[in-house]
Amino acid sequence: MVPLRSFVLLNSLFLVLLAARTVVTRVIDKDNSDRIVKTQNDQNLSKVPFNLEETYTADFLAYVFNGTWTSDTTIVYTDRRTGDILQFDVIKQRSTLIVDSSVMDAYIVSNYVLSPKGRYLLIGYDLKKGYRYSTFMRYVIYDIEHRAYHKIGNDMHIALAKWAPLTDDLIYILDNDIYYMRFSNNGFNDVQRVTYDGISGIVYNGVPDWVYEEEVLQDSSAIWFSPDGNHLAYASFDDRNVQEILYLHYGEPGNLDDQYPTEVKIKYPKVGTLNPVVSLTLVDLHDPTLNKIDLKAPHYAVGTDNLLYNVQWKDFDHVVVTWSNRVQNKTEIVWYNMYGEIVKTLHVVEHKGWLDIKHLFFYKGSVYIRKLQPSGTKAGRFHHVTRYDETFKQSPTQMDLTPDAIEVQNICTIDQSNGRIYYLASGLGKPSQKNLYSVPADGSEKPTCISCNVLTPEGNVCTYADAIFSPLGQYYVLVCHGPDPAFVSIFNNAHQKVYSWENNLSLRKKLAKRHLPLVKDLDVRANGYESKVRLFLPHNFDESKSYPMLVNVYAGPNTLKIIDAASYGHQVYMTTNRSVIYAYIDGRGSSNKGSKMLFSIYRKLGTVEVEDQITVTRQLQEMFPWIDSKRTGVWGWSYGGFSTAMILAKDTSFVFKCGIAIAPVSSWIYYDSIYTERFMGFPTPEDNLSGYNETDVSRRVEDIRGKKFMLIHGSGDDNVHYQQSLALAKALEKADVMFEQITYTDEAHALFGVLPHLYHTMDRFWSDCFSLSHAH
């Protein structure tokens, strides 16, 4: 389950791998301006509020980095205006044309990727959406040298196509089987079939099934090349014993082809039911027989009902795999050699919650992972960069390289030549921040914040950053997402800015003509914990007036609503156009605040995080007379929809007058096994059945009586099934509790196809609840 923002935009991901080419067709100078364009006197501009339609489209969405490092000094990217593929030289600071967009004119292109040697262009077209990350496309290969096209996979829809590193060889997956396509100097050579047991919707090779795609890999790929491209590790998922979810697809109104609804069946493991059986295989791509070796899971450590969490290559000869037990509180990290033998292991256990082991890094005989470590504070443990000696004795020594009450969110890279680790972490006491830090790999110095010295074009300190490093770490792209609109710069490893990639000047000019909400951050102590609160106030806020307040909730475990990335979604419309205070509250269970707060939600979803939303809102009403306690509402999507329904059910003192739950979980017995069991365990009397019953909204509908409640769901939701809302609706109807319900026919979890209707529907609901004039 992944949090949804207030608006969603589908962008094609152009994953471009290209070695430097010597043939230059033309040279293009990128605009390297740092300027902020001012329109005469910005202070005297006539400003207007945001329109609702602007907040769920891309009107105020910032451009970020649209390239891929292909060497330590070159980036390949797509020109947003022309569609041409260009290569940018960081040292020369100029771009050269690699492929003209006209080569794709014959296709409705969704994706294109250059081969590592730069001779071939893989073009994906005729896209069909899969699940959250997966797509199916037809593919054609364009030979740049001979200007010829070659269709692959018999022009069938292919689930995945990927170039091997360093070569012009290709892996593609058709009907859940893996194919290896070789190329030689003379062009296309031959295709070898790697697997033969794939069954559509049942047995998957090289691509994940639904639950692994959504909850574990968060990707459409389950193949991992060795650094030289000679070997391939691939995962297989056997869903034969996994039960199916079934829903109906109703089709286009009035279309004779849709006279009868179509059944949609998906293998979907719910809590306590059988999971897919996962296996991992290693294949030598340069062996004519494609010899395969099983990389067996360490059953002694993680049991037979285990999960495959991460696969990576340490070097040419070793695969490092992270396995977990089913409830994800025991992890075994295993080093395999090319014979499938276990060389070494690292065992990690979490006794008070769940594990969140991510990518590993290696440097001079040590391995570096992100692991919970004591902070020396009452907040408990935080995820830190932890170094292990790779010899791994019985009790391997570990060293915390980032001690303090800050949360390391991601390790970016290790600069092998200088022995420095780069990572992203929150600020001290600032869970909403994400900054780029570095620390020596030997721990000889304290960490240094790199992005804390970077200023936005408006002159503010960057407080929310991402970084993309070149292969050897000599340069990096820094994307500053906040507090101001995003801007993108290239730095060298001495942290000197060498180039401005994107300043979003047009977005900044548009924002100069819009009213923006005032932002108020505060800490509120509730239920023995400090909750973070962010209030968005109307631009013309007057303390002597009384305003309605709308709380937008998610509250899922290990998530945040309050981050310092700039966004211009629903909150800017409600504040500037409707004069409604908009609130985010991060209470117990939220991330970046230490293990005590994080794990307080463990095995009891729908309890403490919901109580904090209610208690903090009540305290805000008592603290500030300008918050109208008679006009306070709440809404959320997905887990936030669950939180909304549970808030209304538990709010016996009527802190909230109304709420909207979009695509909510109503009972965790209906949700998928991997996500739910991570936080709740099993729904059995021996384990945590009482916890599941306690968090079932349908058992609490009587306490929703007297509040305005709207329930919204798409009937084609493959993630949080329509069954969830129907179960809640049935309970409300049986109890004779009045509510409103909107069903979006055939729409999936994100409701992409009906966003205008969705937001106009919500706007009318808030107008009624808050006694506002109807805007639409």
UniProtKB/Swiss-Prot annotation:
What GO CC annotations are associated with the protein?
extracellular region; plasma membrane
Q: What is this protein called?
A: Venom dipeptidyl peptidase 4
Record-annotated disulphide pairs: C449-C452, C462-C480, C658-C769
Compartments in which it is found: Secreted
What are the recorded GO MF terms, alphabetically? aminopeptidase activity; dipeptidyl-peptidase activity; serine-type peptidase activity
Arranged from A to Z, the UniProt key words for this protein are: Allergen, Aminopeptidase, Disulfide bond, Glycoprotein, Hydrolase, Protease, Secreted, Signal
Q: Which family does it belong to?
A: Belongs to the peptidase S9B family. DPPIV subfamily.
Upper classification of the source organism reads: Eukaryota, Metazoa, Ecdysozoa, Arthropoda, Hexapoda
Give the domain of life. Answer: Eukaryota
Under the heading PANTHER family, the entry gives:
PROTEASE FAMILY S9B,C DIPEPTIDYL-PEPTIDASE IV-RELATED, VENOM DIPEPTIDYL PEPTIDASE 4-LIKE PROTEIN
Report the EC number(s), separated by commas if there are several: 3.4.14.5
Where in the body, by tissue, does this protein show up?
Expressed by the venom gland.
Q: What are the annotated glycosylation sites?
A: N44, N66, N329, N504, N577, N688, N693
Question: What does this gene product do?
Answer: Venom dipeptidyl-peptidase which removes N-terminal dipeptides sequentially from polypeptides having unsubstituted N-termini provided that the penultimate residue is proline. May process venom proteins into their active forms and/or modulate the chemotactic activity of immune cells after the insect sting.
What's the source species for this entry? Vespula vulgaris
Q: Where is the active site?
A: S638, D717, H749
Q: Does the keyword Magnesium apply?
A: no
Q: How is its activity regulated?
A: Inhibited by diprotin A.
> So what does this thing catalyse?
Release of an N-terminal dipeptide, Xaa-Yaa-|-Zaa-, from a polypeptide, preferentially when Yaa is Pro, provided Zaa is neither Pro nor hydroxyproline
Example GO biological process term?
proteolysis
